[in-house]
Amino acid sequence: MLKDDFLKYQAKTTPNPLGISVAKAKGVYITDTNGKKYLDFVSGVSACSLGHCHPKVTRAIRKQSKKYLHVMVYGEFAQAPAVNLCKELIELLPENQESVYLTNSGTEAIEGALKLAKRATGRSELIGAHQSYHGSTHGALSLLGLEYQKTRFRPLLPDTRFIRFNSEDDLKLIT
């Protein structure tokens, strides 16, 4: 029932989604509504690096949720967790890196990187890699190296070229 409703009502991100009906997840495993466990090779950023329901993460979420869940994230309000994270990151970076641009997703980070690349270089050309995935916003789709996923959304950003992974010859395409 859940899988049928998922396939009927929710937009898919791939032609053939797994459609596993998730009941719970812990560590590297997802458990479906029938109790079958799956090793999660499709996890999101946090689950990928820390595992599902990592105790330190769930404790931090509970602690923070008692204060506030969300206020403007784009540099309008001083929030101790964000400021402390930025400060720690800056201490790890080269001296000429003085600030951190916080985003809520990978695709938003890609959009920020596109703008930064254009601003820093003064050029309009963008480089993507064949067989790459960066997200589903307009800019991220423009860099997507999977034609079947972006063909219906053309025209995309102009001046975009593609290189192959591990091809030194393709690096010459970057102007």
Per-region residue spans from a language model:
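Short, well-ordered beta-strand elements within core beta-sheets of diverse protein domains
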Residues: 29, 47-50, 161-162
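Short secondary-structure boundary/capping elements
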Residues: 22, 53, 81, 163-166
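Active-site and channel-lining beta-strand-loop segments
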Residues: 19-42
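Glycine-rich loop-to-alpha-helix module at the N-terminal edge of alpha/beta enzyme cores
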Residues: 8, 37-123
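PLP-dependent aspartate aminotransferase-fold enzymes
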Residues: 86-175
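Intrinsically disordered, low-complexity boundary segments flanking structured domains
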Residues: 1, 5-9, 70, 88, ...
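Short beta-strand-to-turn element immediately C-terminal to the catalytic PLP-Schiff-base lysine
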Residues: 31-32, 50-52, 143
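Active-site-adjacent loop/helix segments that line or gate small-molecule/cofactor pockets in enzymes
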Residues: 1-26, 67, 81-82
